[in-house]
Design a protein with these regions (language model features):
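Short beta-strand-centered segment that lines the nucleotide-binding/catalytic pocket of NTP-utilizing
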Residues: 51-62, 447
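Glycine-rich phosphate-binding loops of NTPases
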Residues: 58-255, 259-263, 470-474, 567-604
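Extended hydrophobic secondary-structure segments that form protein cores and membrane-embedded regions
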Residues: 216-218, 380-388, 424-429, 525-529, ...
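Extended helical coiled-coil dimerization/tether regions that scaffold
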Residues: 220-386, 407, 413-416
Length: 664
């Protein structure tokens, strides 16, 4: 069993968003504010019972909700009886599962038809009104009461709560709304548009996926802070000592369902308790005698005694339960975990969380005896969500974590021996180093849509990169190797500049920094292709829909034969040997025509919902004053064009004996 895909609607920036899941690891990448966190939160709220807020509704839907409220306050408005009109406004998530024949018993309560024999299975979880009639009546009551109060005193311009239905729901969202689950039609699983909610069918008010999917989540805000900060509540929650206490209580505590191996420690604890009681009796004896001198206890009063209760778990309930030894030769040199580096704290905390998630899922240790009835059964699918694991970690540790995280989650004998019990790991990241360690097919790119593309506000779409370059052809191999070894930061940029040589790669950042301050403030990625390979990235650029500038060399060549390189001249019948210019963007080989093409025709504007453009720049004629004679110079490479354009500057530069440039 595994999750094939989810479809999120009306949840924050994700107005309508389809996300395919990989079999093992799925990585969410994209620029800031592109919806990655929204997708993670949607999974947590729909599947892990996290609390919804009114702001989870896509903000462009508020006017539609207020229109419902405006109708409800009309005197002649009838009480609503169905939820259909809310379908287009509320957060929804469709989940599609792949179920094999021998796993049907797990999903027997949500099969679509009696003829269904496995395969795709879909459910829709929608955050809908619990009781539409109750919401209608209580909103009207609150609204009319507020308006009546406003009229009670003249010359009062204040508008009392609730001004509209959105304001009413903002304070009472979870009171009136809850998750309802519907079974979807597998025959429509591949449809481009999500299917309508089958309101005519009975819905589930309890989570039908409970017992099928176990969901665990590591949030981005993990609470690491200054160890001396007075406000350490969040930090304390994620200290390793606290995590170990929780793990001990659930899986190792010998007082819970004791086994023969636990008897020794229980006996030692009992002997320690008795010794402590005897010591306390001696220490408190003077105080008790003093009380007796005041007449207590009397003849009929119970005698005062001191007794202790000792528990093995209590020994871990302090901040220094986990310490770090600073010297191999001196055991006394130790510090509490809170003084360890933030990076190591984060790494250890995340790895321990993954281990705990796995052992909780497998009902390891004492958890096996603690679970009763249906709770004891192990869910066939474990979904783990990790948000921004790169915090405080340097590059190498980020890469180690992403390589090993899935192995930690599946490092259990039962999981390895039973293929029907699967783990899927979903990670969101801003780190190009994390993206670099992940298979290209596992990346899901979150693309921001500008206002007006599909809504009155900025929204996001998710782009599946699994089949961008086809299946294992030479272009696929080249681009995958290239991006993984150099420039995964492309997935986090607002725009990209492709350059073909090392000179462009070195000089372009300098030009931008010193001459184009507005461009310098943007998130722009400069990719050096190291050759005439820019066109190979065309499928990726079109998939990402990212604004692109390609700086290409003219590479003038002879038209006939093997297209031998030639010095660029007009009227010689030469062509451009650069595929990017001749075949991809300009689609013109003739050198004379290329030199005459205006700038506007060097830009391709893609009229898609994303609306982006690709612009090519190559060498154009430069007029120079050469020893008093004005001449036209045509360059074939970036370096030549740089010299021609700055001819007077280079004339004033010479070299010294060491080869360094000096100005005359």
């Amino acid at each position: 069993m595994r999750i094939l895909a989810i479809n999120i609607q009306n949840f924050r920036k994700l107005l309508q968003c389809h996300i395919d899941f990989s079999k093992k690891i799925t990585l969410f990448v994209g620029a800031n504010n592109s919806g990655k966190t929204s997708a993670m939160d949607a999974l947590g709220k729909f599947l892990a019972d996290r609390r919804f807020t009114f702001n989870d509704i896509t903000i462009s839907k508020r006017s539609d909700i207020n229109q419902i409220g405006d109708r409800w306050i009309q005197e002649e408005c009838e009480e609503p009886v169905d939820l259909a009109e809310w379908e287009s406004f509320v957060p929804k998530m469709d989940m599609w599962l792949d179920i094999s024949r021998n796993e049907i018993h797990y999903v027997s309560g949500i099969i679509p038809t009696l003829k269904w024999r496995g395969g795709e299975l879909g459910v829709r979880l929608a955050f809908l009104p619990k009781d539409i009639s109750k919401l209608f009546l209580e909103y009207r009551e609150a609204y009319f009461a507020a308006r009546k109060t406003e009229k009670a005193k003249e010359k009062v311009e204040i508008r009392l709560y609730p001004k509209n239905l959105c304001e009413f729901l903002e304070k009472n969202f979870n009171t009136y709304f809850s998750i309802k689950t519907f079974i979807l039609d597998p025959a429509k699983a591949e449809a481009d548009e999500p299917q309508s909610t089958p309101f005519e069918m009975e819905c589930f008010t309890d989570n039908p996926l409970k017992g099928i999917i176990k969901v665990d989540m590591i949030d981005a805000q993990r609470g690491f802070a200054d160890p001396d900060n007075a406000d350490g509540t969040e930090r304390t929650k994620k200290q390793l000592s606290e995590q170990m206490r929780s793990y001990y209580d659930k899986h190792l505590d010998p007082e819970k369902s004791p086994s023969p191996e636990d008897l020794d420690i229980l006996q030692a604890t009992e002997e320690a308790r008795k010794a402590f009681d005897r010591n306390l009796a001696i220490k408190f004896e003077p105080a008790i005698h003093e009380l007796e001198g005041l007449g207590y206890p009397g003849i009929a009063d119970p005698k005062l005694t001191i007794a202790t209760k000792m528990s093995t778990s209590e020994t871990l309930k302090h901040d220094a339960a986990v310490q770090y030894a600073l010297s191999k030769s001196d055991d006394s040199l130790k510090l509490s975990e809170k003084y360890n580096g933030l990076g190591y704290q984060n790494l250890i905390s995340m790895v321990f969380d993954l281990m705990r998630f796995r052992d909780d899922w497998m009902r390891e240790g004492k958890a096996k005896q603690a679970k009763q009835g249906s709770d004891w059964a192990i869910e066939p699918l474990h979904l783990v969500l990790v948000e921004e694991p790169e915090a405080h970690l340097h590059v190498q540790v980020q890469q180690v974590f992403i390589r090993k995280a899935y192995d930690v989650l599946t490092n259990h004998k039962f999981i390895k021996e039973n293929e029907n019990f699967a783990t899927q790991l979903v990670i969101s990241t801003h780190s190009s180093h994390v993206a670099r360690e992940t298979n290209f097919a596992d990346l899901r790119y979150f693309k921001r849509l500008s206002e007006g593309s599909e809504s009155t506000i900025a929204t996001s779409k998710v782009i599946n990169l699994s089949d961008v370059f086809g299946k294992e052809d030479e272009t696929d191999k080249f681009v995958t190797r290239y991006l993984q070894s150099t420039h995964c930061d492309l997935f986090f940029a607002d725009a990209v500049i492709l350059v073909e040589g090392s000179a462009e790669n070195m000089l372009l950042p300098h030009f931008i920094r010193n001459k184009y301050p507005k461009v310098y403030q943007r998130y722009i990625s400069i990719l050096s292709i190291n050759g005439r390979h820019s066109h190979r990235l065309n499928p990726l650029i079109e998939k990402l829909c990212i604004p692109t500038l390609v700086i290409a060399d003219m590479d003038s060549a002879e038209k006939e034969g093997h297209h031998k390189a030639a010095c660029p001249e007009r009227g010689k019948g030469l062509i451009s040997g650069n595929y990017t210019i001749a075949q991809w963007l300009v689609k013109e080989k003739d050198l004379d025509r290329l030199l005459a093409i205006p700038s506007a025709k060097k830009e391709i504007i893609k009229e898609t919902p994303y609306k982006y453009s690709i612009r090519v720049a190559y060498q154009t004629p430069v007029t120079i004053d050469y020893d008093g004679t004005v001449k036209e110079a045509i360059a074939s490479t970036f370096e030549d064009c740089l010299v021609y354009t700055n001819y007077q500057l280079f004339k004033e530069i010479s070299t010294d004996d060491t080869g360094s440039l000096v100005k005359r």
